[in-house]
Amino acid sequence: MGPVSPQHTSTEPVRLHRWDEIALEKVTEMLSRKIITGEREMLTQIYLKRGCLVPNHSHESEQMTYVLQGALKFLIGGEEITVREGEVLHIPSWVEHQAEALEDTLEMDVFSPIRQDWLDHTDDYFHK
């Protein structure tokens, strides 16, 4: 049996991204981010200062959080989960969660589908 051809071929070109060429968006005094989007997923670099609190929220997107430096404490369903350097946390769609930076932290988030609220700046839960 030969290879199966895809039913959908992307209209997007292949793109190479360089983090140092992507603008840093200051979301709050405690949190900044860089965003790369594809057709159906989003990759972000997030910089959180120690003590930064991302308030409780949920979203349609499935989320993978990979801590590169530092540590984040998540509160999910009444359970505390600490994610440290080199660890990845998977958060399914619509699961309410909040996070606190236990130290200065650099992490990457992958979202699918794309977080449109981040692109159009309607992610006002950061400012509550």
Residue ranges and their predicted role:
Residues 68-69, 84-85, 103:
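A cytosolic small-molecule/anion-sensing beta-strand core signal
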Residues 42, 64, 71-73, 80, ...:
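Structural motif
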Residues 78-93:
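Short acidic-glycine-tyrosine-enriched beta hairpin
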Residues 93-117:
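Ligand-binding loop in jelly-roll beta-barrel domains
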Residues 47-49, 59-74:
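Short, conserved beta-strand element in jelly-roll/cupin
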Residues 34-37, 46-47, 54-59, 100:
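Short histidine-centered beta-strand/loop micro-motifs
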Residues 1-40, 123-128:
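A short, N-terminal "cap"/entry segment at the start of jelly-roll beta-barrel domains
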